[in-house]
């Protein structure tokens, strides 16, 4: 028998499972399968780009462990994907993050030894980006990984996420549904799938409150990780057949339903993506079609957020019986 022990944590990234949704699919004539990125080593899809962006910069000779200072604006999950990589490789990491992101994110980032600077929540991700640029300008040997602009972001999804979906569905996937944060997942995986089958439909998901990709204005919303309020550089908008808008409330309700009815504890953006996928699978023209929806992160990262507000209060007020 050969040994199957990973040499380090980086070898645990990817090859996440696909699972059918069965009980939140009322009225669906198509099928919906979820790609569980919540089962990555650090519980989110961003583990893939944490790995790819650092590895890519190393291979190009742009950064060196122990010498370079990595800086990145993040809504949390990319920061965590970078933080566990930085810890494993020996980099100093400085992150800027809007103060509106969940408390779990702050704690996890600090647990991995990252330095964290909070930015004005009203300025959204733009504020975090500006702060990161300011810090880089005055920090020696600094390097901004730039997830919104870095080609290594969609590249890893083209090389891994897309092929995994194709293989996992036996090439039978008809539509990809993905929330758009940086646009890396939908661009990379979507491009790969479209090359395998030109008829595959690619659906983006964005918050109704900040529907920039649909021509709307940026605005505050509760779906952490998507709807950055601008069109990211890595996003290939021409790939997308349709952008589905989902409200924060709908996303939260669906995330709750996924836990209660499917046994899947996921974040708010997974709720948004699932709500969009179910809506698509209910359309008469999609009868018999298979939609793969990306669930970007695990629900435990949102315990302090609006997603679990009522349950948290209930739990805090419990008494011994």
Curated annotation (Swiss-Prot):
Q: Which domain of life is it from?
A: Eukaryota
GO MF: cysteine synthase activity
Q: Which GO terms describe its biological process?
A: cysteine biosynthetic process from serine
CDD domains assigned to the protein according to its UniProt record, in alphabetical order: CBS_like
Known catalysed reaction(s)?
Answer: O-acetyl-L-serine + hydrogen sulfide = L-cysteine + acetate
GO cellular component term of the entry, any: cytoplasm
Sorted alphabetically, which SUPFAM superfamilies does this protein's record hold?
Tryptophan synthase beta subunit-like PLP-dependent enzymes
Cofactor(s) needed = pyridoxal 5'-phosphate
Under Enzyme Commission nomenclature, its number is 2.5.1.47
Recorded metabolic or biological pathway in which this protein acts: Amino-acid biosynthesis; L-cysteine biosynthesis; L-cysteine from L-serine: step 2/2
Spell out the InterPro entries in the cross-references: Cys_synth (IPR005856), Cys_Synth/Cystath_Beta-Synth (IPR050214), CysK (IPR005859), P-phosphate_BS (IPR001216), TrpB-like_PALP (IPR001926), TrpB-like_PALP_sf (IPR036052)
Q: How does it assemble?
A: Homodimer.
Q: Which family does the entry's similarity section mention? A: Belongs to the cysteine synthase/cystathionine beta-synthase family.
Instruction: Return the protein name.
Output: Cysteine synthase
What is the primary gene name for this protein? RCS1
